[in-house]
Amino acid sequence: MAQQTIESNNKKSVNRGKDIAKDTILTPNFYTTDFEAMEKMDLSINEDELEAICEEFRKDYNRHHFVRNKEFEGAADKIDAETRELFVDFLEGSCTSEFSGFLLYKELSKRIKDKNPLLAECFAHMARDEARHAGFLNKSMNDFGLQLDLGFLTANKDYTYFAPRAIFYATYISEKIGYWRYIAIYRHLEKNPSGKIFPLFNFFENWCQDENRHGDFFDALMKAQPRTVKSLSQKIEIFGYTLKHPIFDYYHRFRYFLNNHPIVSKLWSRFFLLAVFATMYIRDLGTKRNFYGALGLNAREYDQFVINKTNETSAKVFPVVLNVYDKSFYKRLDRIVENGTRLSEIDKKENPNVIKVLSKLPIFISNGYQLIRLYLLKPLESDDFQPSIR
């Protein structure tokens, strides 16, 4: 993510824009979706719950929560150089992620407000929360002599298109996993105050409730759309032409049936859960491990707790969840983390690029094999996993 150059406290110019702008599979992305399909969504199946959640958003419980106090004064100067770098990296990623959510929710609220006002209002309230979070994180970065240029970011970041159903799945998991991440850190630091390296963590208890409410919204939204958005299967683009001729009617019916079959929902549930869990685990046990160590957390134990809790929570809305209790689940993720270390070691060697690529190929194949085995692991039926809740 790009960020503005700001003079640090020691008057040394700092510019990390190029580093942040560099995208990888593990960095937060910016998203767009099918706004026409979203505005046509029929919420009548679960409108009462969505209206109740919107009323919760209107109350804005955290309106006066994100107010900096005297604890922030000079707090950045007390952090050693190594921990400082780790924490700034955490702030950058978190701010980018929150701002990404703001842009998506804000654009949705603007595009669908005329035809789907209830949905638009919910997205507007969530955009408010995400903007507040991003701004608060950006102020903490300013304590370290840095600041993200959010305007530049909006104009220059590439946007990834996801169909509405993919947005529902991925964002629900993202919001719920955010809740468990923040509350786990907050509870740990309550018991171990020596690991509280910056006063930002004092705000995590109320902060995580925003994430939880956002997740509840997507839960209710998916209940209002038990299969998928109808317009997903009504057209397909080939060489710039839309197949709307009656001759393609049976083709569209088949695509609609395929997209809406319960088995497909189960496959998508497994895919998005695994994608989010694997990405977090690989990142946290790879490049972020030392940051959690600075907080006094064991990164592996922390991630496994968060994954288990998010998986359990997801059983409230997804038809199946991952069997994270199978002994092979975390072993395979650990193998991918180990492979990541091997890839980094290859990059450090002064060998020709061809040699590096050939050396990495077996590792990439190994990673793909582990992910396929994880995906094919027999899932847990949510009705059996949490019958009392469902």
Curated annotation (Swiss-Prot):
Keywords: Chlorophyll biosynthesis, Iron, Metal-binding, NADP, Oxidoreductase, Photosynthesis
Pathway assigned in UniProt: Porphyrin-containing compound metabolism; chlorophyll biosynthesis (light-independent)
Native source organism of the sequence: Prochlorococcus marinus subsp. pastoris (strain CCMP1986 / NIES-2087 / MED4)
Family: Belongs to the AcsF family.
Function noted in UniProt: Catalyzes the formation of the isocyclic ring in chlorophyll biosynthesis. Mediates the cyclase reaction, which results in the formation of divinylprotochlorophyllide (Pchlide) characteristic of all chlorophylls from magnesium-protoporphyrin IX 13-monomethyl ester (MgPMME).
KW Metal-binding (keyword) present: yes
Record's keyword annotation contains Heme: no
Cofactor: Fe cation
Regions that span the bilayer: none
GO biological process, alphabetically ordered: light-independent chlorophyll biosynthetic process; photosynthesis
Domain of life: Bacteria
HAMAP family in UniProt: AcsF
Pfam short name (any one): Rubrerythrin
UniProt-listed InterPro entries: AcsF (IPR008434), Ferritin-like (IPR012347), Ferritin-like_SF (IPR009078), Rr_diiron-bd_dom (IPR003251)
Protein's UniProt name: Magnesium-protoporphyrin IX monomethyl ester [oxidative] cyclase
Disulfide bond sites: none
GO molecular function, one term: magnesium-protoporphyrin IX monomethyl ester (oxidative) cyclase activity
Catalyzed chemical reaction(s): Mg-protoporphyrin IX 13-monomethyl ester + 3 NADPH + 3 O2 + 2 H(+) = 3,8-divinyl protochlorophyllide a + 3 NADP(+) + 5 H2O
EC number of this enzyme: 1.14.13.81
